[in-house]
Each structure stands twice: as C-alpha cells, then as structure tokens.
C-alpha cells in the first residue's frame, strides 16, 4: 500500500477446496478494508490458498488470486439472485453472477433456496481450483456449473454435521430434488452411485453442481 493508504484484512471463512495426504487447497474468503485519504472501501474475495505438509506442520506455499469467467450480462434470474444474496456474496462470486457465466440451472436452484433459507456462498468459479484437486479433470466450478456454500441458517455447515435434520441438510435435499448431479456434503443422501456423496473434503461445506 502507498503511504496514504492503510489496509486491514480479515478471514471470513477458510474452506477446503481439495485435500491430499500432504497438500491441500484452502479456499479462503477474505474481507479487506482499505482507507485511502478520507475514503474507506471494503471488498471480499475468495483466494485459492495452497498449503503443504512438511512432516511437522502445514505451510502456505502459494496464493492463487481469483479470476472471473468471461460472459456478457446476467440473466433476469441471476439479477434477482444477486438482490437476494448480495450481503452474503463475496465480490468474486458476485462478479461471476454479473458476468452471466453461472449456469442457469444453478442460478434457478439457488433462487428457490434463497426464498426459504439464508446461506453464504464461498465460490462459484473465481477462487476455485480449475481442476478437481489432485487430478487433471476440469471442475464443474470452472464452467460455472458449481457452487460451494459454507453457511446455512446462520451456522457453518461444519457445525451442522451431526444433525439429522438441519438447515444445511435441508438445502442439500432441496438440491437433490431439483436434479443436481453433484451434491458433496457431510451426508450421503441417496446411497452409493447417486448424485450425493460424503467424504473428508465435504465436511465443512456443501458442493452443489450440474454436469454439462
């Protein structure tokens, strides 16, 4: 920062974006307050923070800045979703929506959910690894077909893991009923081979996506 600017950053939420034995992606929602002269601006962005385990501790080895998908203009449904969620949207997720690059099916699903519950989005595309972590397979996030949600009903998904009927589980069930083809969550809602799955990676968020 220049001499006449001061910045303070705060971590809103760190969420796993990929997990291997000795490395991980931690998608970190960061809110930054910058005062320049008499003006204060605030931005919230999601960064792909890469960490590695050296046998003793986990260390940050890279921070990948978010990018925005190319697009044109948001659909009416996306505009309405922004109005519903904007206080809970990181700027990177907002940019993906305003670019019109988020899949219509995903926008419609989130719009229905926002009508009945409150939730906070971590990431659509910007800030998410381009590939499924540790593989060469493109992520549905990269094409605007996936979303990660870290908080539902005012509580983190992580804190709702052990509850048989929680707001987070209700959102996952809504996505399953709506035809989402990937539902990563702390619970497997439809058994082996179905759209829903649970693993160590998806204990701290909901991953909702549609295949192309």
Where on the chain are the PLM-derived regions?
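A short, structured loop/turn motif at beta-sheet edges
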Residues: 16-24, 52-56, 152-154
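Surface-exposed, charged secondary-structure patches
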Residues: 2-39
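Short consensus segments that form the blades of beta-propeller domains
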Residues: 37-41, 137-138
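Catalytic cores and adjacent binding grooves of peptidoglycan-active enzymes
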Residues: 50, 57-80, 100, 108, ...
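Core segments of small alpha/beta cavity-forming domains
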Residues: 1-5, 96-101
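Acidic helix-start/capping segments at beta-turn-to-alpha-helix junctions
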Residues: 1, 17, 124-133, 191-192
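Acidic/histidine-rich, surface-exposed loop or edge segments in extracytoplasmic proteins
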Residues: 77-97
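Extended, low-complexity, intrinsically disordered C-terminal regulatory tails
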Residues: 102-136, 184
């Amino acid at each position: 920062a220049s001499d006449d600017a001061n910045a303070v950053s705060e971590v809103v939420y760190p969420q796993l974006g990929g997990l291997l034995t000795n490395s991980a992606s931690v998608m970190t929602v960061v809110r930054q307050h910058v005062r320049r002269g008499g003006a204060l601006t605030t931005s919230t962005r999601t960064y792909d923070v890469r960490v590695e385990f050296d046998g003793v501790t986990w260390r940050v080895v890279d921070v990948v800045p978010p990018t925005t998908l190319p697009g044109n203009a948001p659909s009416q449904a996306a505009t309405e979703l922004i109005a519903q969620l904007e206080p809970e949207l990181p700027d990177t997720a907002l940019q993906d929506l305003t670019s019109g690059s988020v899949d219509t099916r995903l926008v419609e699903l989130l719009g229905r959910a926002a009508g009945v519950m409150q939730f906070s989005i971590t990431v659509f595309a910007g800030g998410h690894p381009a590939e499924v972590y540790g593989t060469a397979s493109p992520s549905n996030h990269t094409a605007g077909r996936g979303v990660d949600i870290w908080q539902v009903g005012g509580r983190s998904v992580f804190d709702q893991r052990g509850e048989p009927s929680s707001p987070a589980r209700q959102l996952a069930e809504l996505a399953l009923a709506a035809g989402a083809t990937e539902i990563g969550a702390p619970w497997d809602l439809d058994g082996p081979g179905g759209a829903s799955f649970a693993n160590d990676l998806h204990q701290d968020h909901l991953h909702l996506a549609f295949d192309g």
